[in-house]
Regions:
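Long, contiguous binding/interaction regions
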Residues: 1-62, 69-183
Length: 183
């Protein structure tokens, strides 16, 4: 059965859907994340990934990085609505295809199996510059930092080799060169 789409994700005459990374600088206080997420869920916007961390202890600031999908008018509406929330200091939006922005995700992958399969899996992980964090005779845990689609591909390839557990962060983003987007 096909997954129902949100009314906000339907193509319109104003443009087609595209993935966007929305970065929001907020006060680091109780309830702020719930308000930001509530804005998305209350309007039927989907969040594909989410990463949140305090970035300035003195100023009590946190940075929320949200990956979502929508038409240009939906993304504009999301940004406007986020900007109206009291604890929000700044909102930035980047297309996933923006060549000026670096996007990465981190994944921890656990593989368990016989020696031959483990050796094959380790060789495969080296192609992704994976870092082995833990290993035994029957298993290993690897850390991979890459684009979402690259991690998806690695996960699919490792499944038949004994992949038993996956833990992933949401996307994080940073401008290239000396350009900075900050609070």
């Amino acid at each position: 059965m096909p997954k129902p789409k949100s009314a906000y994700s339907q193509p319109t005459k104003f443009g087609k859907e595209d993935h966007h990374i929305i970065v929001v600088w907020v006060d680091n206080e109780a309830g702020v994340l719930a308000r930001v997420i509530g804005l998305f869920s209350g309007r039927g916007y989907n969040i594909e990934s989410l990463a949140v961390a305090e970035i300035d202890k003195k100023k009590h600031l946190s940075r929320i990085t949200i990956v979502t999908k929508g038409t240009p008018e939906v993304i504009k509406q999301i940004k406007l609505q986020l900007g109206k929330l009291i604890p929000v200091h700044k909102v930035a939006d980047f297309s996933r295809n923006d060549p000026k922005i670096l996007f990465k995700e981190l994944a921890l992958l656990k593989v368990v199996g016989a020696t031959k399969k483990l050796d094959k899996a380790k060789k495969l992980c080296k192609k992704y510059d994976g870092l082995i964090l833990d290993k035994t005779k029957k298993s290993f845990v690897i850390q991979v930092t890459a684009l979402r689609r690259e991690i998806d591909k690695l996960v699919a390839t490792l499944k038949p080799l004994g992949l038993i557990s996956v833990s992933r962060t949401g996307a994080v983003a940073m401008t290239k060169g000396d350009e900075v987007f900050t609070q």
